[in-house]
């Protein structure tokens, strides 16, 4: 289902935990990371599509999350021609998305990436709200930045852009999900420095 301009209605999901860390999923057999997203089916509201995609891609149900906010308007990105199937070139331009900010109220063990026959992700992790977006496929980076920026106003404490260190490299490394009782591996400076 495309609009008159050739954009497919879609939802995007920014899932945060109690520390305002963001859930990132690694695409199956790829080295790129992204947020859960998916198309809105005929007759679905954006909220219904969001809950369906959240369960299909992450394994979480409505009782595992709380809706914190959503974007005011559609955010669009165009898909380069070489990513578009030949038979729909000329008609399909890209995606227009309503983005939702969700707080996870469930536990990390509630995440199930293998709920469907064709999973989207093969790994996941929590990371700072502001992270360099070079691990995201290039044509989606701008819409990610706009969604993160617009939805940051709903965070319970300010999430300011963090200094860019090696966070992009961190997303590329293989890690298992961090347990909430494990100490952070980040080093902190003493207050007198």
Swiss-Prot record:
Keywords: Hydrolase. A motif (Nudix box) lies at residues 38-59. Its EC number is 3.6.1.-. CDD domains: NUDIX_Ap4A_hydrolase_plant_like (cd03671). Residues 6-149 form the Nudix hydrolase domain. InterPro entries: Nudix_hydrolase, NUDIX_hydrolase-like_dom_sf, NUDIX_hydrolase_CS, NUDIX_hydrolase_dom, RppH. Its cofactor is a divalent metal cation. Pfam families: NUDIX (PF00293). It is an enzyme of class 3 (hydrolase). Residues 174-193 are annotated as: Disordered. Disulfide bonds: none annotated. The keyword Hydrolase applies. The keyword Nucleotide-binding does not apply. One of its GO terms (molecular function) is pyrophosphatase activity. Accelerates the degradation of transcripts by removing pyrophosphate from the 5'-end of triphosphorylated RNA, leading to a more labile monophosphorylated state that can stimulate subsequent ribonuclease cleavage. NCBIfam families: PRK00714.1-2, PRK00714.1-4, PRK00714.1-5. PANTHER family: ADP-RIBOSE PYROPHOSPHATASE, DIHYDRONEOPTERIN TRIPHOSPHATE DIPHOSPHATASE. Belongs to the Nudix hydrolase family. RppH subfamily. This is RNA pyrophosphohydrolase. The lineage of its organism: Bacteria, Pseudomonadati, Pseudomonadota, Betaproteobacteria, Burkholderiales.
């Amino acid at each position: 289902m495309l609009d008159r301009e050739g954009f497919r209605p879609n939802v995007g999901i920014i899932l945060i935990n109690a520390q305002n860390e963001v859930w990132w999923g690694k695409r199956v057999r790829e080295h790129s990371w992204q947020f859960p997203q998916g198309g809105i089916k005929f007759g679905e509201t954006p909220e219904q599509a969001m809950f369906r995609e959240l369960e299909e891609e992450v394994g979480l149900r409505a009782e595992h999350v709380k809706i914190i906010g959503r974007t005011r308007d559609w955010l669009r990105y165009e898909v380069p021609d070489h990513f578009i199937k030949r038979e729909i070139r000329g008609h399909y331009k890209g995606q227009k998305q309503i983005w939702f900010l969700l707080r996870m109220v469930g536990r990390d063990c509630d995440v199930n990436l293998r709920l469907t026959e064709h999973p989207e992700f093969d790994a996941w992790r929590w990371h700072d709200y502001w992270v360099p977006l070079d691990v995201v496929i290039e044509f989606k980076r701008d819409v990610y930045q706009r969604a993160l920026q617009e939805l940051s106003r709903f965070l319970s404490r300010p999430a300011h852009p963090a200094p860019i260190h090696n966070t992009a490299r961190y997303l590329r490394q293989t890690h298992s999900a961090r347990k909430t009782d494990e100490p952070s591996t980040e080093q902190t400076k003493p207050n007198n420095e």
